[in-house]
């Protein structure tokens, strides 16, 4: 985890709730909380102006007989996009049920200031906020030295868009062709996805000032909407600040033969480029499904109802196996919400399969062990979990990096002042603004593993992504400048599971990603680590490297030594997918059809990352937004 994140809480204020009012207390620092307070106040004003009363959009908890056309479980990435589109024309009543609340209030600046994301991103032993995260831990991972890994999962309006790294890019064209082939539906090819990608976001190009001339960001603007009528509410932009180390990595990769990519959103990933984020280009704050889709809906729709701090316990069905609503719990009070048309699960890769299983849809053996009546025997529920890890060496550098925020008495206060007063400085950048994607190279993998990758994945699918992480994996407290040339594995073979050992959805499910379980993944991890070292050792990078490798140190040379270091220090990618996978009718592990409908029942869909048939080649956020747009369009069209 980035080391500086343990310190930044000293810059955060304390929040108190008294008599229904939010009270803000300034810290000794130049407080940043005004950013959160101002945004929340503006959002409230907008809703009051648009709808007359704030409460007109929020649930009458426990009101008998509450029924809506569509009930959406989970107010996260997909759930809020679906809610906005289904309620947009006012003809459908829509309820969103969210276990959390507003992250701006419950977590403050750590969720809004781009560089503060790492406060709650990892389990650092010091910072815990169960108000907006499920605090899920995995089973012990043999491939990661037996560690039980913290797995970030947003429990808040906005979901993991309020928690994650804000990275926005799309998969390769080959990935979406594979999706279409896997589910038997050509509407999932790249050309058919593209309108929904465009419909979900607003793109802003890089600023020419203060961006340095040697930090040019290229982008294929045809991948984004050409007019305001075609675009959506999510802000996609480049961070205001460019990390100093990134221009050196760019120059090094160019000399190593990496072609220049066009921003990673046009279906072509192989190459190098600065990467876009979901950061508002004017306020320079995190933009989420809540600040985009939800706020738009609250301003414009009369038919959306948002029910917060409410946990869904199970799905109700009638005698014809049609979903008729959900049983929920709000503060210990259990009640029911009805659905006239459909229930849509958007609870995420862990909680969507959990809800299916406690409601009687899943592997028969699992359900019978817990005395759950089997409504539909679906052996694929909770199977096929796919995620990856991030790894790499750390080196001292001669340019300013975000690692200075830890241990320097000047850098953090200065950065807070710059952000608070001018929206400039280190805090405008999340610390990872430069990426590259590469296929495996001849000789860096065994012939057998290379052949397996070539057979399993499309020709334009990268094996590795490389990230210029402007910080350290392991905390350093000396205030010096470090950077980690990092890599993620994108063509993995390990598969994990999500299951349950209780019928209570207040209990976390049992999550076992099985990272590096497959020996081919271990081989790729070592190859990626060596490639990172090769980049750092290049003539260009050596001009800015300021001494010997800090971590793990050059005494780690053999494959076994490197693999042990990776097992002990690598972090989760937090991009799990596939636990309620789409598939063809003859696929025994398919949970959904290509319209995201759950097999064996009626009136129930799953629309979130769990619906992916496989992990795409990179970050899933852009594809989750587009999937929600796509399925919502299908529903509205009556398909």
Swiss-Prot record:
Its cofactor is FAD. Pathway: Mycotoxin biosynthesis; sterigmatocystin biosynthesis. Its EC number is 4.2.1.143, 4.2.1.142. Disulfide bonds: none annotated. Glycans are attached at residues 109, 214, 444, 501. One of its GO terms (cellular component) is cytosol. It catalyses: (2S-3S)-versiconal hemiacetal = versicolorin B + H2O; (S)-5'-oxoaverantin + H(+) = (1'S,5'S)-averufin + H2O. FAD binds at residues 77-78, 98-99, 164-167, 609, 620-621. It comes from the Eukaryota. GO terms for molecular function: flavin adenine dinucleotide binding; lyase activity; oxidoreductase activity; oxidoreductase activity, acting on CH-OH group of donors. It is found in: Cytoplasm, Cytosol. One of its GO terms (biological process) is sterigmatocystin biosynthetic process. Residues 263-301 form the PAS domain. Induction: The genes forming the sterigmatocystin biosynthesis cluster are co-regulated and induced on oatmeal porridge or the fungal isolates were grown either on oatmeal porridge or in YEC medium (0.2% yeast extract, 5.0% corn steep liquor). It holds the Pfam family GMC_oxred_N. Keywords: Cytoplasm, FAD, Flavoprotein, Glycoprotein, Lyase, Signal. Residues 1-19 form the signal peptide. Homodimer. Belongs to the GMC oxidoreductase family. Norsolorinic acid reductase; part of the gene cluster that mediates the biosynthesis of sterigmatocystin (ST), a polyketide-derived furanocoumarin which is part of the most toxic and carcinogenic compounds among the known mycotoxins. The first step in the biosynthesis of sterigmatocystin is the production of hexanoate by the fatty acid synthase (FAS) units stcJ and stcK. The polyketide backbone is assembled by the non-reducing polyketide synthase stcA by condensation of the starter hexanoyl-CoA and 7 malonyl-CoA extender units followed by cyclization and release of norsolorinic acid. This is Versicolorin B synthase stcN. The lineage of its organism: Eukaryota, Fungi, Dikarya, Ascomycota, Pezizomycotina.
């Amino acid at each position: 985890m980035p080391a500086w994140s343990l310190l930044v809480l000293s810059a955060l204020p304390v929040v108190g709730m008294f008599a229904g009012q939010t009270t803000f207390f300034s810290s000794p620092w130049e407080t940043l909380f005004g950013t959160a307070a101002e945004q929340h106040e503006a959002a409230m004003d907008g809703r009051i102006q648009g709808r007359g009363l704030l409460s007109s959009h929020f649930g009458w908890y426990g009101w008998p007989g509450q029924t809506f056309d569509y009930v959406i479980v989970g107010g996260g990435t997909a759930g809020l996009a679906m809610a906005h589109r289904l309620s947009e024309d006012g003809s459908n009543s829509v309820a969103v049920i969210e276990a959390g609340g507003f992250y701006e209030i419950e977590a403050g600046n750590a969720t809004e200031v781009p560089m503060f994301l790492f406060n709650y991103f990892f389990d650092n032993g010091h910072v815990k906020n169960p108000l907006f995260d499920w605090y899920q831990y995995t089973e012990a991972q043999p491939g990661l030295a037996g560690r039980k890994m913290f797995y970030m999962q947003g429990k808040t309006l906005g979901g993991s868009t309020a928690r994650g790294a804000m990275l926005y890019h799309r998969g390769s064209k080959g990935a979406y062709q594979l999706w279409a082939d896997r589910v038997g539906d050509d509407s999932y090819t790249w050309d058919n996805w593209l309108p929904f990608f465009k419909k979900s976001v607003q793109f802003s190009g890089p600023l020419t000032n203060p961006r340095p001339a040697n930090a040019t960001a290229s982008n294929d603007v045809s991948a984004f909407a050409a007019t305001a009528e075609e675009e959506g509410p999510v802000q996609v932009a480049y961070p205001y600040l460019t990390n100093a180390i990134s221009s050196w990595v760019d120059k090094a990769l160019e000399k190593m033969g990496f072609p220049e990519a066009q921003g990673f959103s046009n279906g072509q990933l192989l190459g190098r480029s600065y990467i876009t984020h979901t950061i508002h280009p004017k306020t320079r704050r995190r933009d989420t499904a809540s600040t985009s889709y939800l706020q738009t809906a609250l301003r414009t729709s009369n038919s959306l109802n948002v029910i917060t701090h409410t946990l869904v316990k199970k799905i109700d069905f009638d005698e014809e196996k049609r979903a008729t609503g959900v049983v929920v719990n709000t503060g210990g009070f259990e009640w029911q919400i009805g659905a006239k048309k459909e229930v849509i699960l958007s609870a995420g890769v862990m909680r969507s399969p959990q809800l299916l299983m406690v409601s009687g849809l899943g592997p028969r053996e699992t359900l019978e062990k817990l005395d759950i009546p089997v409504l539909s025997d679906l052996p694929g529920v909770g199977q096929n979990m796919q995620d990856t890890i991030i790894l790499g060496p750390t080196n001292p550098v001669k340019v300013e990096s975000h690692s200075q925020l830890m241990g320097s008495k000047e850098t953090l206060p200065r950065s807070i002042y710059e952000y608070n007063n001018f929206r400039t400085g280190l805090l405008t950048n999340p610390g990872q603004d430069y990426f590259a994607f590469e296929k495996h190279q001849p000789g860096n993998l065994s012939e057998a593993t290379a052949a397996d990758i070539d057979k399993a994945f499309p020709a334009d699918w990268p094996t590795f992504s490389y990230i210029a992480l402007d910080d350290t994996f392991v905390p350093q407290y000396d205030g010096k400048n470090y950077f980690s040339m990092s890599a993620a594995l994108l063509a993995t073979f390990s598969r994990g599971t999500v299951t349950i050992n209780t019928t209570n959805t207040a209990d976390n499910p049992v999550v076992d990603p099985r990272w590096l379980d497959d020996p081919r993944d271990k081989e790729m991890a070592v190859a990626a680590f060596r490639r990172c070292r090769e980049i750092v050792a290049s003539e260009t990078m050596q001009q800015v490297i300021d001494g010997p490798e800090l971590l793990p140190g050059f005494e780690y040379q053999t494959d076994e030594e490197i693999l042990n270091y990776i097992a002990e220090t690598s972090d989760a990618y937090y991009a799990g997918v596939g636990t309620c996978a789409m598939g063809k009718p003859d696929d025994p592990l398919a949970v959904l059809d290509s319209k995201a409908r759950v097999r064996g029942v009626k009136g129930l869909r799953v629309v979130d990352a769990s619906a992916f048939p496989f992990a795409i080649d990179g970050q899933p956020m852009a594809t989750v937004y587009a999937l929600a747009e796509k399925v919502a369009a299908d529903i509205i069209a009556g398909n």
